[in-house]
């Protein structure tokens, strides 16, 4: 009888021990689940906060773009739009202090795309190699000490046929995607060329643009020396440097004045002008520890004497993170 009671007590003790362990395991499991839920909740909150901040930074960038439009519109309204030069407020936007906003700032740059070489001018209206634009692109590459085979690859990228040009490349040479076979909308398409190197793209980018008009005039008041040399073989490096120096003091008031300064006795190889309709707007926003860059290509339509100045967005690209901010 005594042994039986002892055995019963031992069984009861073991059962209480098992129950205690079970309770502890349940509490541990609940604690793990609660911790995981709390961690996920914190991640979700951070994710939502980052999304909200990124979206707000983008809206600030659009506000900066709207301000850039006002500068470009005011240039026309004030009667200065007939001549666009580097002394005008839109051209000096990057020299102004950033706009201060709550927990951040907005930096604005405006660049005249008609002061750059138009990559789409490499082909003519029939989608074939242009007798002027194609060799000019080669000349630009040589002037920048870059591989002039890029010109062949670019021509094959945007021309309408599938015939390789010298060292060029057509659809069969690009695994996973095809050539455009038409004028491009953004210079970043150059990155897709078969042999394009990142450092070469970075060196070439400040001198080029892609415009919807193959024959858009080059603005001699904003073009850099490398582009000015493309206008005529008689424009030497030294002469191009002198022309750029003139730009810094207001540039040229007439085409004849430029031709005389450049030593041109006949028309330039491409159309030239004194004003511009195509601009690149770069907006960099710092907001709540977030960086946002928006690059917009604008076409400015001057309107009529009674009509307002209007703008068309040809392209807009944004990047939440940037690595080239100075």
Positions of predicted regions on the chain:
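Short coil/loop residues immediately preceding or within conserved phosphate-binding loops
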Residues: 15
């Amino acid at each position: 009888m005594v042994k039986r009671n002892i055995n019963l007590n031992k069984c009861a003790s073991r059962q209480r021990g098992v129950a205690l362990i079970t309770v502890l395991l349940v509490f541990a499991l609940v604690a793990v689940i609660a911790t995981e839920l709390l961690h996920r909740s914190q991640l979700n909150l951070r994710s939502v906060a980052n999304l909200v901040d990124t979206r707000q930074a983008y809206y600030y960038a659009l506000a900066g773009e709207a301000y850039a439009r006002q500068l470009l519109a005011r240039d026309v309204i004030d009667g200065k739009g007939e001549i666009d030069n580097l002394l005008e407020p839109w051209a000096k936007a990057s020299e102004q202090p950033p706009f201060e906003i709550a927990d951040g700032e907005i930096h604005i740059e405006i660049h005249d795309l008609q002061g750059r070489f138009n990559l789409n001018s490499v082909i003519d209206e029939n989608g074939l190699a242009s007798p002027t634009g194609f060799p000019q692109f080669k000349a630009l590459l040589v002037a920048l000490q870059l591989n002039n085979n890029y010109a062949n690859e670019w021509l094959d990228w945007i021309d309408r046929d599938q015939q390789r040009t010298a060292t060029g490349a057509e659809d069969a040479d690009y695994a996973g995607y095809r050539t455009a076979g038409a004028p491009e909308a953004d210079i970043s398409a150059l990155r897709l060329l078969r042999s394009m190197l990142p450092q070469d793209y970075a060196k070439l980018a400040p001198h080029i643009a892609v415009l919807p008009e193959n024959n858009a005039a080059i603005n001699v008041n904003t073009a850099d020396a490398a582009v000015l040399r493309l206008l005529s073989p008689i424009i030497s490096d030294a002469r191009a440097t002198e022309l750029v120096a003139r730009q810094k003091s207001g540039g040229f008031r007439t085409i004849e004045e430029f031709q005389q300064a450049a030593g041109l006795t006949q028309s330039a190889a491409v159309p030239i002008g004194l004003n511009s309709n195509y601009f690149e707007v770069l907006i960099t926003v710092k907001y709540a520890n977030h960086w946002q860059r928006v690059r917009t290509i604008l076409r400015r339509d001057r309107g009529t004497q009674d009509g307002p100045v209007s703008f068309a967005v040809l392209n807009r690209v944004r990047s939440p993170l940037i690595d080239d901010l100075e």
